């Protein structure tokens, strides 16, 4: 447990202090529908849009389908597919596919603090060119007494065999249930790139809507 807490704060510190060459402000939006299909198994369909260049141009649009199964109260696993449209600087569109598998672990640190770890193995690319990436995300949630607000922090690294860790994300988020089956989350994220031409630091505002069918 202590190792996990130290890892969260270490990665958060590293991602906030990393040096990069270019900056951009982006906004990300997503809407997801969740449906229980059988016992302990949910289907999630998610669509998202991302804007770049100070949120003035399209960067990415995607549709994601995921099946997640609960193994026990702490461990879950999932498989998913994402179809992605990407716009380059000249606004030319290219398509990518992503296939991924997740393993989740969650537990409580105390009565009001809980943590979660997500390990993701993904392969993404074009028809003949795919790249394998390991992503590990650490999240810490706090249950505020007598309120429905749900604050959280998270940090995630991206690792490839060729480059090692080539991307770090740090996120602060605040969730709120708008209705019984409708949740909203607003987040601020900083993303750093490494070992690429013209590495960027992205400052991101993200809005999410999730509805349970």
Regions found by a protein language model. Name each.
Residues 47-53, 81-87, 107, 121-125, ...:
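Transmembrane beta-strands of outer-membrane beta-barrel pores
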Residues 68, 103, 176, 201-213:
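Outer-membrane beta-barrel "beta-signal"
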Residues 1-25, 213:
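Bacterial Sec-dependent N-terminal signal peptides
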Residues 21-78, 87:
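Start-of-domain marker
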Residues 25-27, 59-61, 95-99, 130-134, ...:
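Residues that define the transmembrane beta-barrel architecture of outer-membrane proteins
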């Amino acid at each position: 447990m202590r190792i996990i807490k130290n890892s969260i704060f270490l990665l958060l510190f590293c991602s906030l202090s990393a040096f990069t060459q270019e900056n951009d402000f982006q906004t990300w939006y997503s809407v997801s529908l969740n449906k229980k299909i059988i016992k302990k198994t949910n289907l999630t369909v998610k669509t998202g849009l991302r804007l770049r260049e100070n949120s003035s141009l399209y960067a990415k649009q995607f549709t994601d389908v995921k099946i997640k199964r609960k193994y026990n109260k702490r461990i879950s696993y999932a498989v998913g597919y994402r179809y992605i449209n990407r716009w380059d600087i000249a606004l030319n569109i290219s398509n990518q596919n992503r296939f991924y598998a997740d393993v989740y672990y969650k537990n409580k640190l105390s009565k009001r603090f809980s943590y979660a770890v997500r390990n993701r193995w993904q392969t993404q690319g074009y028809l003949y060119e795919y790249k394998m990436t390991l992503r590990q995300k650490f999240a810490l949630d706090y249950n505020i007494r007598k309120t429905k607000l749900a604050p959280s922090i998270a940090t995630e690294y991206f690792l490839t065999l060729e480059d090692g860790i080539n991307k770090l994300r740090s996120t602060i988020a605040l969730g709120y249930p708008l209705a019984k089956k409708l949740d909203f989350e607003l987040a601020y994220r900083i993303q750093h790139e490494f070992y690429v031409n013209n590495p960027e630091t992205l400052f991101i505002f993200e809005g999410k809507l999730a509805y349970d069918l």
